Amino acid sequence: FSKSQAKLLFGENSMLAHAAGRYFDINKSVALKVIALDDNVAGTVSTGNITLTGTATGTGTLSFYINGNVYTAAVAIGDTAAEIATLLSASINENTAEQVTAIATVGEVGLTSVHKGTYGNELKLRINYNSDESTPLGITSVITAMNGGAGNPTLTNTITILEENQFNLIAQPYTDNATLGLIDTALTDNFKATEMLDGFCVVGVDDTITNLTTKTDALNSAFITVLDNNTVFSTGFEHATGVIAKISDNAQSNPGGGYLGFELTGFLPLTQRIRTERNSLAGGGVSTYTVVGSSIRFDRTVTTLQKDENAIAIP
């Protein structure tokens, strides 16, 4: 199985093709298996937009990012917001692997996710990223984040594949506690004394510190790792897939080396949380990162397990 096969089988703009691409960019030696799911027919897509206003009084380049991918529009003096929006929309649609489609209407670029469900809400939008990028004079922009995606597939039948089969590391995109509870039950059952099949599920979640630690407290699982996705310019699914790629590669090449401080390559960092926030998250069962320049480095990778079966805190 390879990156090119994932594009061929699932479509180059699919969730699986993007996640598999992240995996194989990091790890080309450890086998990857994937499970394809249809969208929930009752689900809804995510939408967002960037609204431009004004007329350019200076030349330059407008740089707009979707999930870390940059799209540009060359701007000349006198260009209107509507003209720039048309250029930007064309640039986005030219990339047939992008996970949104774009339509320009009078200075606004409307974006619609390819997939239904909550996944599209995680696609991050940003104007300018690098220090040498700036919006041309005379033009202003307002971004509406991707939102409105709902109705994920039901994993009840899919979970049966985990029963009595060993998958050491699992990344998946659906982070509601009901879905994660199903996965935890399956992985816990696999680890019973008669089987001892280990396996861990990794997910990335964007949220506040309070909401993240509330989630991990409710999960309290020895088999689920929740990543703080606020630090990474990516969806949680791609982020989680990159992490399992790095961990499995590191485990094979340096089994006793551990994972503290290793670099997650191929992802753009966003502003990191301060140390006290990261400590609070780690203490609550959330895996965190430190950003060093353009590098994302693991602080620690933890599961959400915090209390034993008697609800006593585990030191």
Roles of regions detected by a PLM:
Residues F1-G58, N93, V100-T105:
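Extended assembly-interface regions of large multimeric machines
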Residues S2-G11, G54-R126, D189:
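Extended, beta-strand-rich, solvent-exposed assembly scaffolds of outer structural proteins
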Residues A17-Y23, L111-T112, T156-I159:
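Intrinsically disordered, low-complexity boundary segments flanking structured domains
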Residues H18-A19, A85-T96, G138-A145:
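Short, surface-exposed secondary-structure junctions/capping segments
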Residues F24, G68, A90, I161-P315:
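A glycine- and small-residue-enriched flexible loop/hinge signal that marks low-structured segments
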Residues A42-N49, T53-G54, I139-L155, Y289-P315:
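Acidic, glycine-rich low-complexity/disordered segments
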Residues V100-I103, G120, L125-G204:
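Long, acidic/polar, low-complexity amphipathic helices and coiled-coil-like
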